Amino acid sequence: MRILGLTGSIGMGKSTTAKLFAEAGVPVYDADAAVHQLYEGEAAPAIEAAFPGTTANGKVDRPKLSARVVHDPAAIKQLEQIVHPMLGASRQKFFADAEAANAPVVVLDIPLLFETGGEKRVDAVVVVSTSPELQRERVLARGTMDEAKLNAIIAKQTPDAEKRKRADFVVDTSHGLEPVRAQIAHILAEVVKMPQRRA
């Protein structure tokens, strides 16, 4: 089984690309969705114990938790120590299920793949990319953040040019879905020929 790491900066089209991998029959592990699931249940008691008042009705109140840890590196580290082992267990279950289903390829959808050293745990890296203009246009069209917040997020992420340089495959999402589907088909044909690389 080959493990593909899928990453890309905000607004590049990573979520759409992940959906198209799933549409092609590839099991996809969504790291963000897995964290949200943990916040909905399993992780809530430990988070409440560490950060009192950040949960309600057995679920993590994400805005409250974010406000509590955002400017406190020690608190962020403490939160990671709670969540990461649970995340690791959910990822292992995903791998076991994929192995049982004889999946030749799986995708790990990890927004901060390079920032967290995740590229060492995969056989090949797929970076989703588009022009900076289209990236801004997409994010600002969502209406969930302004230019200043977008700039702050982009500043924290590995630059797109560096991600592309470190990628085994680059998916360009500038021209609609059909070209992306074609790029995915090419990647799936190529990755099974590649040697296993993960540590």
Curated annotation (Swiss-Prot):
Q: Which residues cross the membrane?
A: none
Record-level GO cellular component terms: cytoplasm
Instruction: Report the GO molecular function annotations.
Output: ATP binding; dephospho-CoA kinase activity
Q: Which domain of life is it from?
A: Bacteria
Q: According to its UniProt record, where is this protein mainly located?
A: cytoplasm
User: What is the reaction catalyzed?
Assistant: 3'-dephospho-CoA + ATP = ADP + CoA + H(+)
Pathway per its UniProt entry is: Cofactor biosynthesis; coenzyme A biosynthesis; CoA from (R)-pantothenate: step 5/5
Name the enzyme group at the top EC level. Answer: transferase
- Gene3D superfamilies, alphabetized: P-loop containing nucleotide triphosphate hydrolases
Q: Where does ATP bind?
A: G11, M12, G13, K14, S15, T16
Q: Which UniProt keywords apply?
A: ATP-binding, Coenzyme A biosynthesis, Cytoplasm, Kinase, Nucleotide-binding, Transferase
For the biological process aspect of GO, one term held by this record is:
coenzyme A biosynthetic process
Q: In what residue span(s) does the DPCK domain sit?
A: 3-199
Under the heading Pfam families, the entry gives: CoaE
Question: What InterPro entries does this protein's entry cite?
Answer: Depp_CoAkinase (IPR001977), P-loop_NTPase (IPR027417)
Q: Which SUPFAM superfamilies match?
A: P-loop containing nucleoside triphosphate hydrolases
Q: Where in the cell is it found?
A: Cytoplasm
Instruction: Show the CDD domains listed in the entry.
Output: DPCK
Role played: Catalyzes the phosphorylation of the 3'-hydroxyl group of dephosphocoenzyme A to form coenzyme A.
> What is stated as this protein's family in its record?
Belongs to the CoaE family.
Query: What's the name of the protein?
Result: Dephospho-CoA kinase
